[in-house]
A protein has these predicted regions:
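Phosphate-binding/switch loop-helix module in NTP-utilizing enzymes
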Residues: 169-227, 293
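Conserved P-loop
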Residues: 115-164, 168-170
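Hydrophobic anchor at the beta1->P-loop junction of P-loop NTPases
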Residues: 106
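P-loop (Walker A) phosphate-binding loop of NTP-binding proteins
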Residues: 109
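Pre-Walker A adenine-sensing motif
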Residues: 87-97
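ATP-binding Walker
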Residues: 100, 112-113
Length: 310
């Protein structure tokens, strides 16, 4: 079962998520060649308007002080199960880790490492033997796998072992069919047994809606369904042009449980620019309020939690 076109004859994406077929096959970012957005991880996809191929599935800066925490650690001792983000230094800024099943967001401008952050977040789960789903609205499946390989992360092997699904979706088609995709994605999360999920980037989805109220309601409904599915989810978002501390449309920071801000910071002498991360909020967790420098290296993001920016 599952042969032929993975999305059935009525693929609403016109082949844009896979490598073939429909009139809009040049759409934004499907897989190259085989047309299987899950990297081979699929069962029999029933042809039809309400099944999108998710069905029947059988993831030395200047020395500074240690992170400052605002509250008594005992205040946050509870039965909440927590997990690390998977980024060196950043995890040390979060006391005990983020609560599992949280909805997280990372906000940043171009070149701040949002996709690297997301891949590293997912890699943490995969290397721990868990499963993950990566949904990209702006790249192909192959480019995501290539980027992970360049960082030394075994995403292709995880996909071959049916522990990782990388799905490339055209943002226009996603916006047009969001309620159906939302329902099928929730089913995929459950049947795939995903522990973590990434949506890169929610900004492209937001851009598909012209009316602010429609944009808010659609994004809210989508993120709420992810929250209710029980998977720990990370959304990437472009920063506002006006301030690095807000997302482009000012929505995701209010819908998510945790917000990480990535930005370029320029020194007072204007001669040096550094990358800096700040934890804007984490519900049910104590965390550092300091802004800390980080680098994007050939092995991922490293945060210097013991250092000052300049």
């Amino acid at each position: 079962s599952g042969g032929g076109r993975p999305f059935g004859a009525d693929d609403p994406f016109g082949g844009s998520r896979g490598g073939g077929g429909g009139p809009s096959g040049a759409g934004g970012g499907g897989t190259e060649g085989g047309g299987d957005p899950f990297g081979g991880y699929r069962g029999a996809a029933t042809a039809g308007d309400d099944d999108f191929g998710f069905g029947d599935l059988g993831g030395d800066a200047d020395a500074g002080g240690p992170p400052d925490f605002d509250a008594d650690p005992d205040e946050f001792e509870s039965e909440i199960t927590r997990t690390d983000i998977g980024i060196e230094g950043l995890d040390d800024m979060i006391l005990g880790g983020v609560p599992k099943r949280s909805l997280l967001s990372v906000i940043g401008g171009a070149g701040t490492g949002k996709t690297t952050f997301a891949l590293q977040f997912l890699n943490r789960a995969l290397e721990s033997g868990n499963r993950g789903i990566y949904i990209t609205l702006e790249q192909t499946r192959e480019s995501i796998l290539d980027t992970a390989t360049e960082k030394g992360w075994s995403f292709r092997e995880h996909a071959d072992e049916d522990r990782l699904a990388v799905v490339a979706i055209d943002p226009i088609e996603m916006a047009n069919s969001l309620s159906s995709i939302r329902n099928d994605l929730v089913r995929l999360i459950s049947e795939f047994g995903a522990d973590r999920l990434v949506l890169d980037s929610v900004s492209l989805l937001e851009m598909m809606y012209d009316h602010p109220a429609k944009r808010r309601s659609e994004v809210f409904g989508f993120t709420r369904s992810l929250k209710e599915s029980g998977v720990t989810t990370l959304l990437t978002s472009e920063a506002s042009e006006d301030t690095p501390y807000a997302s482009r449309h000012g929505i995701v920071e209010y819908l998510t449980d945790a917000v990480f801000v990535l930005q370029y910071v320029r020194g007072s002498d204007f001669r040096e620019t550094r990358l800096a991360v700040e934890i804007q909020k984490i519900r049910d967790a104590n965390h550092s309020r300091e802004t800390k420098p980080y680098d994007i290296t050939d092995t991922g993001i490293s945060v210097y939690d013991q250092a000052n920016i300049f």
